[in-house]
Design a protein with these regions (language model features):
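An accessory alpha-helical subdomain
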Residues: 68-163
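Rossmann-fold dinucleotide-binding core
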Residues: 3-68
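Short linear Ser/Thr-Pro motifs
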Residues: 2-3, 107
């Protein structure tokens, strides 16, 4: 999957012959987000083993598509993606388990949450599994989320005890 960088970059370095040039890329959008055009959408790149000339050519090519080309290491990508894409997919899949539906009382916030459910569950389930399994930082994200839920639940419990 494009959504994880460290694992596939390590595999490419280990398995590909040195004559093969490799660049790790991640368009930070899918079909839903890019359906109206690519302009301004983030596109991450890291040079795994490409020659400088090849690397520059691809950077220029993707830049010419008017995407926001972000050059960052695979490690930095996975760190940031765990807390952006990873948590979004985790929350979306978790909310989907609640089988929430439409309601006439839906606030804008609720509609936004339902949009997250729709967007993340529209992606293949394997993408979710890969994000959670192969990104070395998503476990830390999930543990942080669990801790935040516990803290919030405890704060509510304290407020209930005041009554």
């Amino acid at each position: 999957t494009c959504s994880v960088k460290l694992y596939p970059a390590r595999v490419m370095k280990r398995l590909l012959p040195p004559t093969i040039q490799a660049i790790a890329t991640h368009p930070m959008f899918g079909p839903d987000s890019g359906k109206d055009g690519l302009e301004g959408l983030p596109f991450v790149m890291d040079n795994v083993s490409a020659h400088e000339e090849t690397w520059r050519w691809w950077v220029d090519e993707f830049t010419s598509w008017k995407m926001d080309v972000l050059m960052m290491s695979c490690d930095q990508h996975d760190r940031e993606a765990a807390w952006s894409q990873g948590i979004t997919h985790f929350i979306g899949r978790t909310l989907a388990e609640l089988n929430l539906g439409s309601t006439r009382l839906a606030t804008k916030g609720y509609q936004t949450l339902m949009g997250v459910v729709e967007q993340t569950c529209n992606d293949p389930l394997q993408l979710f599994y890969d994000l959670q399994r192969y990104n070395p930082y998503t476990k830390q994200m999930r543990m942080g989320l669990r801790g935040a839920l516990v803290t919030t639940m405890e704060a509510l419990k304290e407020q209930e005890e005041i009554l």
